[in-house]
Amino acid sequence: MENGEILLTSWLNRSVHIEIFDERKFIGKFLCTDREGAAILSNTTEYNKGFSRALGLVVIPGKHIKSFSVRA
């Protein structure tokens, strides 16, 4: 297994924070990525301009991801 795969595997089922280029933020459990680099999250909450909403399962295309961090 290569270093990138090891790192990605260590993030599975962890809580992550993703910000996309339109300034929305998503916090959810990281499930996987697809071949195009999209992040798939479950139990996700979206935060936008002071409001939040529960979304559940979401797919965030990699080309829209501004930042990705694993929460402690």
UniProtKB/Swiss-Prot annotation:
The primary site where this protein sits is endoplasmic reticulum
Molecular-function annotations in GO: RNA binding
One Pfam family for this entry, by name?
LSM
Q: Does the keyword Plastid apply?
A: no
Cellular component (GO) terms are: endoplasmic reticulum; membrane; NatC complex
Q: Where is the Sm domain?
A: 3-72
One GO BP on record is: protein maturation
Report the SUPFAM superfamilies cross-referenced here: Sm-like ribonucleoproteins
What does this gene product do?
Component of the NatC N-terminal acetyltransferase, which associates with the ribosome to acetylate nascent protein chains in a cotranslational manner. NatC acetylates protein N-termini starting with methionine, followed by a hydrophobic or amphipathic amino acid, with amino acids at positions 3 and 4 also contributing to NatC recognition. The first 4 amino acids of cognate substrates are recognized at the Naa30-Naa35 interface. NatC-dependent acetylation targets various substrate proteins to specific subcellular sites.
Q: How does it assemble?
A: Component of the N-terminal acetyltransferase C (NatC) complex, composed of the catalytic subunit Naa30, a large auxiliary subunit Naa35 and a small auxiliary subunit Naa38.
Protein name from the UniProt record = N-alpha-acetyltransferase 38, NatC auxiliary subunit
